[in-house]
Amino acid sequence: MDYKQLKQEFNTPFYIYNFDFIKERFLNLKEAFKARKSQIFYAVKANSNLSLLQMLANLDSGFDCVSIGEVKRALKAGAKAYKIIFSGVGKTKEELRQALEYDILYINLESEAEMMLLESVAKELNLKARISIRVNPNVDAKTHPYISTGLNENKFGVEIDIARKMYLYAKNSSFLEPVGVHFHIGSQLLDISPIHEAAAIVAKLVRELKALQIDLKFFDIGGGLGVAYEKNECEPDLYDYAQGILAQLHGLDLTIGMEPGRYLVAKSGEFVCSVLYEKQNKTKRFVVVDGAMNDLIRPSLYEAYHEIILPYNQGEESLCDVVGGICESGDFFAKARSLPSTQSDDIMVIKNTGAYGFSMSSNYNTRNKVCELALEEGQVRLIRQRENFEDQIALEEKFLKA
């Protein structure tokens, strides 16, 4: 990658995503489940750039959306409505109404209250809402507590007993059609045994429902496949992942749904920034760059590790903190990281930032959001232009008092 040329053409900081890498990951995951009917629903929240969504739609991907805005993004990018599912804990009445009007595949319900709200909306529209229920199997995903979602103490899904009652209610409703079951126990899982454990619990529920003449069509295993951010980490084997799921579904005629996000896009992305200067005090060396936590918040929010390289710098290394210009002590990309000495304008590359990078960015400190680039078949193109100050104030300026 010619970072100097990219910096000259687009300036820094910027994100760049390798679309060919994403395609390869997508096809490998699809291949792992070829023994059974399956559908990938890409988790839009991981990276919602329209060009990236369009590329996946062209591969016949489905999309897992957690807001009506994400549903609209997927449709705008060319997704088929019947390959979109709508998940998330806090769906509003208006979001549910629009989802039904778009005639998406199904809505993942997270509570009894949400089911009753959806039923009332469907009744108003004189439609039958296709539903799946997110079951919380109370399985420990053994991941960061902020991204663990499968325990009773987490806000997601409903317990097995409540789910059973919800399915029975939906079966007898004139405006609800139960078509699937869903679970997602957490994100960034390098040990996939908890997913297999959860699949066994939920498959048992499906068999119980079948005995009650509730025949579901979709068995949605969520996402959660982890990626190797650090060199000592190993990614899950896709064959083992798939076989562990398939083993739980013997005798059940179900389409497997899966919701990869991070797994598809994280390692495709790099956040490229420039060194502004170094700062040294009695105890610590700081490398100050033109990117900041508003661009990439994962290190600040989760203490997440990202490999950092200086592609054109060599020489003796020493420990340093890599920090941005935000007025927060939590504004850092790395702490106590061993890097060579730097000078103003040196290029720094922060690796594995294709997921939850730009999609979690903000305008904190009135900083402009960065541009995004795609690398595809050896060619680099702009897929989101850099924001400017006028973009930031466009929705406020007209309200200034004369």
Swiss-Prot record:
Q: Which InterPro entries match?
A: Ala_racemase/Decarboxylase_C (IPR009006), DAP_deCOOHase_LysA (IPR002986), De-COase2_C (IPR022643), De-COase2_CS (IPR022657), De-COase2_N (IPR022644), Orn/DAP/Arg_de-COase (IPR000183), PLP-binding_barrel (IPR029066)
Superkingdom in the source lineage: Bacteria
EC supergroup of this enzyme: lyase
| Cofactor(s), names only, from the UniProt record | pyridoxal 5'-phosphate
Pathway in which this enzyme or protein is active: Amino-acid biosynthesis; L-lysine biosynthesis via DAP pathway; L-lysine from DL-2,6-diaminopimelate: step 1/1
Catalysed conversion reaction: meso-2,6-diaminopimelate + H(+) = L-lysine + CO2
Q: Which residues carry this modification: N6-(pyridoxal phosphate)lysine?
A: 45
**For this protein, what is the EC number?**
4.1.1.20
Keywords for the protein's UniProt record, in alphabetical order: Amino-acid biosynthesis, Decarboxylase, Lyase, Lysine biosynthesis, Pyridoxal phosphate
Q: Name one GO molecular function term.
A: diaminopimelate decarboxylase activity
For the ligand (substrate), the binding residues are: 262, 298, 302, 328, 356
Q: Which Pfam families match?
A: Orn_Arg_deC_N, Orn_DAP_Arg_deC
- Record-annotated residues binding pyridoxal 5'-phosphate? 224, 259-262, 356
Provide the function of this protein: Specifically catalyzes the decarboxylation of meso-diaminopimelate (meso-DAP) to L-lysine.
NCBIfam families tied to this protein: lysA
UniProt similarity note: Belongs to the Orn/Lys/Arg decarboxylase class-II family. LysA subfamily.
**HAMAP family hit by this protein:** LysA (MF_02120)
Name by which UniProt lists this protein:
Diaminopimelate decarboxylase
Species in which this protein is naturally found: Campylobacter jejuni subsp. jejuni serotype O:2 (strain ATCC 700819 / NCTC 11168)
> Could you tell me the gene encoding this protein?
lysA
